[in-house]
Amino acid sequence: MLRNAAAGARKAVTELSQFPKPGEKLHGFTLVRSKHVPELELTALHLQHDKTGADYLHIARDDSNNVFSIGFKTNPPDDTGIPHILEHTTLCGSEKYPIRDPFFKMLPRTLSNFMNAFTASDHTFYPFATTNAQDFKNLMSVYLDSTLHPLLKKSDFTQEGWRIGPENPLAEDEASKKLVFKGVVYNEMKGQMSDAGYLYYIRFHDHIFPDINNSGGDPQKITDLTYEQLQKFHAEHYHPSNAKVFTYGDMPLIDHLKQVDTQLQAFEKIQGDKQVHEPVTLNGPKEVTLYGPLDPLVDQDRQYKTSVSWIMGDTTDVLESFSLALLSTLLMDGYGSPLYRGLIEAGMGADWSPNAGYDSSAKKGIFSIGLTGVQEGDVPKLKEKVQQILRDARNKGFDKTKIDGSLHQLELSLKHKTANFGFSMLNRLKPKWFNGVDPFDSLAWNDTINGFQAKMAEGNYLEGLIDKYLLNDNTLTFTMAPSTTYGEDLVKEEQERLSTRIQAAIKEAGSEEKARKHFEKQEQELLVEQNKTNTEDLGCLPTVHVKDIPRSKEAVVVRDENANGTKIQWHEAPTNGLTYFRAINTLENLPDELRELVPLFTDSIMRLGTKDLNMEQLEDLIKLKTGGVSVGYHCTPSPTDFHAASEGIIFTGMALDHNVPVMFDIIQKLVLGTDFDSPEAALRIRQLLQASADGVVNDIASTGHRFAMGSAESGLTRSAWLRQQVSGLSQVQLVTSLASRPETDKLEDVISKLKQIQNLALVGGNLRTAITCGSESVAANGASLQNFVGNLSRDPLNLKNPSPRQLPKDSKTFYPLPYQVYYGGLSLPTTSYTSAEGAPLQILSQLLTHKHLHHEIREKGGAYGGGAYSRALDGLFGFYSYRDPNPQNTLSIMRNAGQWAVDKKWSDRDLEEAKISVFQGVDAPKSVNQEGMGRFLSGITEEMKQKKREQFLDVTKDQVREAAQRYLVDGLAKGEGRVAFLGEKQAWVDGEWQIREMDVKGAE
């Protein structure tokens, strides 16, 4: 009865008959058309605003995680980053919310599980997601007013965009008074442009789409942007006539339309910037070579990045675009694909280039095939080799099994119920929508699949696409060569540009002293403006309330079974005919030398193949029969003792219910059957290592603060130390060291250890499993699991108990890396998950982030990001900064934050906001396969979670102060803090710091 009622409710949300008919008016909008898409369980409605012409797409679906986005077409007129700086400054105060930074001030006043803003190459959009109806209205009000009626103050432009000012205006020494370029976006883009992968993609984009300038901004050009240009660009582009609004979920469309119409009615219709830029015309071969940064952790001889690109057809042809994406998968995806085998396996490069594959986000599709880690002598050979592989693939044709495998992956992606389906939908539709592709065509999955299968039935369809687009020389070959002086050249250029600006200011002011006074005065005025953030009245901002948060949450129902010695956690839930499997094999006394190679082991078993099946055959089987299987390293502290840690190997898999036995068979084949003795095993493992090492400096930079935090934490707890060995900077050093071994090295010592891991991965240790599936599949899955475990000859492990390891004692560690900005972390030990003191620490981290650190580290210090965190399970409290130009200042702020929190007179509102922030994460929607996983992975029971929930709701101001005193102030005084920073080594990194060079062992 209840099930039928739920089905009825689901149907009601998407029932076409409840919506207006095309042509009908609705709160200032006219419904243009509607479409029910049963395969996605949704109904799409396209509306247009009568007065302004604003486009509106609503997707009705029985999903409580509702999404909103407003976006604008923002073709950048130059490389000054005007769309990017505007994206930042619109969020610094608006007519209805005239306070500093309402976007960040809203973060602790909302239960949203996602809030952000993004600048794409030719459009800018502002999305959020929440399950709370009042919250949705609140955020929509702030987003609409921020984008359509921003204050755009000059001080916001200088803070977020760029300015010249003293390096540290609060310090008295001469070095701190040195004039430098500053600004949040300026520093962000300096960080981005020192990432060789990002730089390659941006410069490639410059040449394939010469009419689309760099929307993010080139630091060399950002300093040309004026405040007046920013205002003009906003007036012309952030207008309803140039807007696309998107809503998704189960909340009533009528409520959304009323609210949006109220905001749009103030505008008259104008001619929006609807220009859709075409790529370059290629009537023959074109070659471009530019210089980029050298990666000091990779073989100096393999530093080139190069690619060959073709222009495809119009992406409004959704069927052809889908087919080209599938063709790209068949040609490039997986170790058995022809291009992987012919290029990377053949040793021409280490990995795919950042632009590789089919890109359908613009008006015309772009098909690129390229490599990183290429030797200079191989660069001119790439195009001919690619053409040869494409001709061979075209003549051979495509195996139906491989095509069916790709279509099967598509089927599973539709069935898999994710918590962020609406946001994924927005990301899939939005870029094409802004470039003229009808979103209704993009939504018509079944029509596209049926059309594809009809074309395939005619014969030679994919081969015909290769003929049509790829077997010609209308190509762009784009190469980035390494320059040993690239970083120095950037610094020199910046100094010259700064000097020119200062000279111009001196000329205008009449003297050097007057010019300096002008810059110092501007900086002081900005500081005064920034300091208002601590005292201004936020009463105008809407908020949800702690009283609206339920004191208890419906528990996830799981049950335990011990079937013939196999421990199973069952979670029965509606899964759309899918079964999700996890298993953990806990390993006691795992030696360090084996642990650090577990990531290489898990990569190797997805690469080498078995004695009976090569990797291509295994990949085909995985795609055809599962939604993916994986093997990885697992470690967790105990919820009752954060100093204790258990570790092991984790196995995951997903499949349609009837394919579960095959999924188990595949896992067994991969783990136990991988052939480490094959003649090419050493070569394949070397290629895996080289692919991991290639671009590692850029990979670190993309999450540099996480690497810094991980390094700091590794000196505090066993669990954090284990993580550092497997996924931190220690792992990076191991991989780069192994990758740099000479080609003559057969890696016998490494392979011997990988075989030891293979012998204990699945059959040694203590195995426990978890299955999430529909009730109707429990019996069959139980039998399949019994069969799987029964086939494993499980032996007791005989690993020697290692002597207890002392954690590193270095209180300050510095990693010299070639970045223009810094990444840092400071960490302290706290208490276990079940301790009552954990809740005040979590609240404290939110208070410090929103009330202090964001203001000090980002707004005043110029870093792209900074904050505090408390990880209850890990028993750690810490601070971080990201893309930070001012690390000394940041470290001082971190060290003094505890005392600041003790001295601060917290208000009831402060506490309320911090609790709301915590519950964004606590109550964020979960995908069905994540339910019950805290218990399985780490032993956190529903009772523990409920207790923690009540503790969060009941935290007092005194408890927060006590936690700050005990764990931060006293902890630092006792020397319990650990610090790590990454970046360029300068004079301030003195003898107190332990310097950890990241050099490759054995490299010249």
Curated annotation (Swiss-Prot):
One of its GO terms (cellular component) is mitochondrial matrix. Its main location: mitochondrion. It is found in: Mitochondrion intermembrane space; Mitochondrion matrix. Gene3D superfamilies: Metalloenzyme, LuxS/M16 peptidase-like (3.30.830.10). Its cofactor is Zn(2+). It is an enzyme of class 3 (hydrolase). Degrades mitochondrial transit peptides after their cleavage in the intermembrane space or in the matrix, and presequence peptides; clearance of these peptides is required to keep the presequence processing machinery running. Preferentially cleaves the N-terminal side of paired basic amino acid residues. Also degrades other unstructured peptides. May function as an ATP-dependent peptidase as opposed to a metalloendopeptidase. Monomer and homodimer; homodimerization is induced by binding of the substrate. This is Presequence protease, mitochondrial. It comes from Gibberella zeae (strain ATCC MYA-4620 / CBS 123657 / FGSC 9075 / NRRL 31084 / PH-1) (Wheat head blight fungus). The gene is CYM1.
